């Protein structure tokens, strides 16, 4: 998979939300994802990750070796000072 394919899948689920994707190693199989969405309100961190992993369940292991996920609500993101 490439960055555009990952963004396309995420945008289909997180419509009009903020999404950033980075190829962590430049190898096309390790990615860092930042998703800022109010769909995460009252959702645990584990469940946020599950939501995102479910979008890629057919690509994990075969095309994606690792995903680093940062998932925030809009309010949580506004409170971040180090990003």
Q: Model-found features: residue ranges?
A:
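C-terminal structural segments of small proteins and small subunits
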Residues: 54-83
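Short edge beta-strands and adjacent turn/loop segments
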Residues: 16-32
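N-proximal, solvent-exposed amphipathic alpha-helical segments enriched in charged/polar residues
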Residues: 1-17
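Histidine-centered active-site/metal-ligand motif
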Residues: 30, 49, 65
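Short, non-transmembrane amphipathic alpha-helical segments
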Residues: 6-10, 46-60
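Short loop/turn motifs enriched for small/polar and acidic residues
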Residues: 24, 36, 70-74
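Short polar/acidic secondary-structure junctions
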Residues: 11, 24-26, 61
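A short interface-forming secondary-structure element
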Residues: 34-47
């Amino acid at each position: 998979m490439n960055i555009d394919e990952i963004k396309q899948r995420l945008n289909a689920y997180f419509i009009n939300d903020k999404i950033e994707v980075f190829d962590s190693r430049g190898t096309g199989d390790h990615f860092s994802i930042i998703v800022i969405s109010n769909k995460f309100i009252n959702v645990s961190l584990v469940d946020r990750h599950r939501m995102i992993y479910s979008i890629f369940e057919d690509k994990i292991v075969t095309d994606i070796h690792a995903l680093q996920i940062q998932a925030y609500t809009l309010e949580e993101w506004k409170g971040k000072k180090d990003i």
